[in-house]
Amino acid sequence: MSEKKIDLVIVTGMSGAGKTVAIQSFEDLGYFTIDNMPPALVPKFLELVESSGENDKVALVVDMRSRLFFKEVSSILDKIDLNETINFRILFLDATDSELVSRYKETRRSHPLATTGRVLDGIALERELLAPLKNLSQNVVDTTDLTPRQLRKTISDQFSVEKSQTSFRLEVVSFGFKYGLPLDADLVFDVRFLPNPYYKPELRDKTGLDKDVSDYVMQHQESEEFYQHLLALLAPILPGYQKEGKSVLTIAIGCTGGQHRSVAFAHRLAQDLGQNWTVNESHRDKNRRKETVNRS
């Protein structure tokens, strides 16, 4: 048996959320991959991998097919967890219900759990059955607004074989509550209580990345007080998540539309945290209002 530990990634999540693209991405990263492996076969397969010693990076798509799914997977994860020769993580792919419905309509495929024929019924049942597994997942990726290329990059950033297994990265994202919470957010902070630049005509069409907007947001006493409290709160939290083995922590800052206040806060937070941590900064809804106006 090989003494080298096996790096195992179990890919799961909502049907239509991008598991096929994900498993192709792992193959490009040098992982040995298998799509749609029945949960019951996973332990025997891992035994064969260990005994051969030929593959130390493995990614498996474990698909949802029945109500027995979580019971089977939970039992398997318990066994894997006891195996000191395997390091494993769960990648859970998710997307909003509306986006999943749109993808099914585009491909004209039926949902595997939609016994009544309605895609939404299948999505609702699958989301309920997968909820416990999502809670166990170390990596949750919301693919709602991701192109296949962007999803591949996300997976490469999180699972590239060149990266250390102990690496820890922060994702700081701004968003608008009116467009929904980011599904992959670990920590969510609400800045809607701050004065809104939207009501300043000269600032309305700008974003929190513009200096005059950022200055307006941060000039208020409550803004600076909240920001300093936020930094103090995160100081002990981040090392704790790192110690527990979490590879990616997503911090989401939200305001009403995701254009001004949350963008200014997220940008400043990313810059400050970047002095001590690896940080990726993104602004999900920064241009959403402008795009909506242009389409109307």
From Swiss-Prot:
GO MF annotation terms: ATP binding; GTP binding
Keywords: ATP-binding, GTP-binding, Nucleotide-binding
Entry-linked Pfam families: PapZ_C (PF22740), RapZ-like_N (PF03668)
Residues where ATP binds: G13, M14, S15, G16, A17, G18, K19, T20
InterPro entries cross-referenced by the UniProt entry: P-loop_NTPase, RapZ-like, RapZ-like_N, RapZ_C
Binding residue positions for GTP: D63, M64, R65, S66
Superkingdom of the organism of origin: Bacteria
UniProt entry tagged with the keyword Nucleotide-binding: yes
Protein function: Displays ATPase and GTPase activities.
Family as reported in the entry's similarity comment: Belongs to the RapZ-like family.
Name of the protein described by the UniProt record: Nucleotide-binding protein SMU_1306c
